[in-house]
Amino acid sequence: MNKVDKKRLKRIKQEFSDGFRLFTLYDKGVVIFGSARTSPESKYYKQAYDLSFRLAKLGYPVLSGGGMGTMKAVNKGAYDAKGKSIGLNIKLPHEQFNNKYTTKSMTFNYFFIRKFFLTYLSRATVVFPGGWGTMDEAYEHLTLLQTKKIKQRPIIFVGADYYKDVFNWWEDVLVVKNKTIGEKDIQKYANLVNSNEEIIAILNNVGGKK
């Protein structure tokens, strides 16, 4: 192993160690994914704020990627509700900035470690509209659930006007035309909803806050 790889390995170990030490006493919460580019005027920004506020009032720790846009709305909602508002940020050369509405936060160098803790610290996944980063996070959770690498959890996509075409593509291309996922996988692993009431009902059906 060369010096560069040794340094990289040391840094990876340190990030994992710091994450476990920082969050070891936290209950499993709800992780909410979404775009860093969502404006405060967007209906989804307002919905994400309302959802996280209500979840925090119900006792759920709320997690986001710790940045701006939907992530800021998520953290601000939980923060304003005086709940546990966790932000797991990432160092990027542009676009990603820490928001100030967290009760506990950490900034990562490595995406895969950040994604590990966003999964490890959560027991349910909510996916608001977003781009490639949001879809990467959503697909990872779907894959982990399908392959039984994580315990059963709800994965909830928010906004039929945004995600309906994605669900249709899964059905038409993945299930029917190519059979690259099981015919019942979509129904089994993914939920598509519009309202926060639907989200909270799904969460309540899987066993409470802890």
Residue ranges: model-predicted function:
Residues 109-161, 207-210:
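Active-site/ligand-binding-proximal alpha/beta "capping" segment
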Residues 92-97, 134, 162-165:
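Short gly/pro/ser/thr-enriched loop/turn and capping motifs at secondary-structure boundaries
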Residues 157-160, 167-210:
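C-terminal functional extensions of proteins
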Residues 1-88:
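Glycine-rich beta-alpha loop segments
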Residues 49, 79, 141-145, 171-175, ...:
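Short, solvent-exposed amphipathic alpha-helical segments in soluble enzyme
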Residues 22-25, 79, 97-100, 117-120, ...:
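Solvent-exposed alpha-helices and their adjacent loops that cap or buttress functional pockets
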Residues 69-128:
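Acidic/glycine-enriched connector segments
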Residues 35-38, 91-93, 130-134:
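Short glycine-rich anion-binding loops that position phosphate/pyrophosphate groups of nucleotides
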